[in-house]
């Protein structure tokens, strides 16, 4: 069979699609995968042929579009960000029409799901969405809030999303010869019976599966999808770890950090206060600029699967993939969140009693030392190991997701053949 995967975002958003694509390819299927231009080398190095799809993520971050949306009280930044959203939609619509031609199923992520849903409707093929956090309306996403309020917040978010995307979506549907949409893309996706794979562990959101029981097998939980690729630095880092006490890992993925130099200095000082070593991952462009300390090792990339279990604790931005890696590693976690869905994971880490969370911009040397002191208490390590034993295994998650896509596509092919008889 032929599968088209359309991914957008940073490595944390793209890697699950690459992991799924590799498994489908291993099973003998034809896989076409579109990724942001800056992710092409990464996906191809994993063993997949990829094409450019959508905006360059690093250029997006360099324009600081994230901060434009945070400056909601100013008019021009949101307008500029909206223009960028519409241009990205138009570009993706053009690219995807050719990428999905002849496919038996097309799959994407949540943010630009409407682009892909329209193309799937045009070709009359099944459609799937990978969810890295509970994005559909539910009452469980923020455990500290009442269920009705959680549902109201998510419903408002999706209505706002539709209003923002309505103009480029209308243009795309005209181009495809489809009727004008009169309801939210989320409603249309659900109505079409799309496969919405929840690529995180069910235990992170207790009660969610029961709340979504009406959707049957259309919202299955499989766990995080990852390639678990090794890096050239892994052996050296593991040797450094073995030569002393287990360090605390710090890394913030692709998130924009205003001053890497100040951040490294803050981390070094907080760890020195506690008598701890630090392993800090920085972007390659910052490697030569950040300060050096005897109790700190600076790296540009490590395998989370290889290194996290050897650390005393993990501090990160709260991306879904990194959160899953720290939970699977069985070590306490501190999430210093930066953007949109990351506070959700901070709240779940706290609810699971395996760590704590705080907004990155509100973090100081004193607060960091205090948060680390909290999560380094023995009960957090004990609880983290307990949770790790209940987490899905990476290979099981990828296999389960591939099984679901095969089943969805094959059932549609069988139905199509029957209708043609």
UniProtKB/Swiss-Prot annotation:
<keyword id="KW-0328">Glycosyltransferase</keyword>
<dbReference type="GO" id="GO:0030259">
    <property type="term" value="P:lipid glycosylation"/>
</dbReference>
<dbReference type="GO" id="GO:0033072">
    <property type="term" value="P:vancomycin biosynthetic process"/>
</dbReference>
<dbReference type="Pfam" id="PF03033">
    <property type="entry name" value="Glyco_transf_28"/>
</dbReference>
<dbReference type="GO" id="GO:0008194">
    <property type="term" value="F:UDP-glycosyltransferase activity"/>
</dbReference>
<dbReference type="InterPro" id="IPR050426">
    <property type="entry name" value="Glycosyltransferase_28"/>
</dbReference>
<keyword id="KW-0808">Transferase</keyword>
<dbReference type="InterPro" id="IPR010610">
    <property type="entry name" value="EryCIII-like_C"/>
</dbReference>
<comment type="similarity">
    <text>Belongs to the glycosyltransferase 28 family.</text>
</comment>
<dbReference type="InterPro" id="IPR004276">
    <property type="entry name" value="GlycoTrans_28_N"/>
</dbReference>
<protein>
    <recommendedName>
        <fullName>Uncharacterized glycosyltransferase ML2348</fullName>
        <ecNumber>2.4.-.-</ecNumber>
    </recommendedName>
</protein>
<dbReference type="Pfam" id="PF06722">
    <property type="entry name" value="EryCIII-like_C"/>
</dbReference>
<dbReference type="GO" id="GO:0016758">
    <property type="term" value="F:hexosyltransferase activity"/>
</dbReference>
<dbReference type="GO" id="GO:0005975">
    <property type="term" value="P:carbohydrate metabolic process"/>
</dbReference>
<dbReference type="InterPro" id="IPR002213">
    <property type="entry name" value="UDP_glucos_trans"/>
</dbReference>
């Amino acid at each position: 069979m032929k599968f088209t995967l359309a991914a957008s975002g940073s490595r944390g958003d793209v890697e699950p699609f690459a992991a799924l694509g590799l498994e489908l390819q291993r099973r003998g299927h034809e896989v076409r995968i579109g990724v942001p231009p800056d992710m092409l080398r990464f996906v191809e190095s994993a063993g997949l042929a990829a094409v450019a799809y959508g905006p360059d993520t690093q250029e997006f971050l360099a324009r600081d579009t994230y901060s434009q949306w945070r400056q909601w009280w100013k008019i021009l930044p949101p307008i500029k960000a909206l223009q960028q959203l519409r241009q990205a939609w138009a570009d993706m619509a053009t690219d995807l029409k050719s990428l999905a031609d002849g496919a038996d199923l097309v799959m994407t992520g949540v943010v630009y799901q409407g682009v892909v849903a329209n193309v799937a409707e045009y070709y009359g093929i099944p459609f799937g969405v990978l969810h890295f956090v509970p994005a559909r309306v539910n009452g469980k996403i923020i455990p500290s809030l009442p269920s009705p309020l959680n549902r109201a917040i998510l419903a408002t978010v999706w209505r706002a999303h539709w209003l923002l995307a309505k103009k480029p979506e209308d243009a795309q549907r005209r181009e495809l010869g489809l009727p004008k949409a009169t309801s939210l893309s989320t409603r249309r996706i659900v109505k079409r019976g799309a496969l919405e794979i929840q690529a995180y562990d069910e235990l992170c959101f207790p009660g969610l599966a029961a709340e979504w029981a009406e959707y049957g097998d259309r919202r299955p939980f499989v766990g995080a999808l990852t390639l678990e690729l090794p890096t050239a630095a892994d052996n050296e880092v593991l040797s450094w770890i073995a030569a002393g006490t287990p360090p605390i890992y710090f890394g913030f993925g692709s998130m924009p950090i205003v001053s890497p130099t100040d951040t490294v200095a803050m981390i070094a000082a907080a760890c020195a206060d506690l008598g701890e070593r630090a392993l800090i991952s920085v972007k390659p462009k910052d490697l030569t600029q950040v300060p050096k300390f005897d109790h700190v090792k600076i790296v540009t990339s490590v395998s989370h699967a290889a290194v996290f279990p050897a650390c005393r604790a993990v501090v990160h931005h709260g991306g879904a993939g990194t959160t899953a890696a720290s939970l699977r590693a069985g070590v306490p976690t501190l999430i210093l969140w930066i953007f949109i869905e990351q506070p959700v994971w901070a709240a779940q880490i706290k609810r699971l009693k395996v760590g704590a969370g705080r907004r990155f911009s509100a973090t100081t040397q004193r607060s960091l030392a205090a948060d680390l002191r909290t999560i380094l208490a023995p009960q957090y390590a004990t609880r983290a190991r307990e949770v790790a034993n209940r987490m899905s295994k990476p290979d099981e998650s990828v296999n389960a997701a591939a099984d679901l896509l095969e089943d969805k596509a094959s059932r549609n092919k069988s139905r199509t053949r029957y209708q043609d008889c």
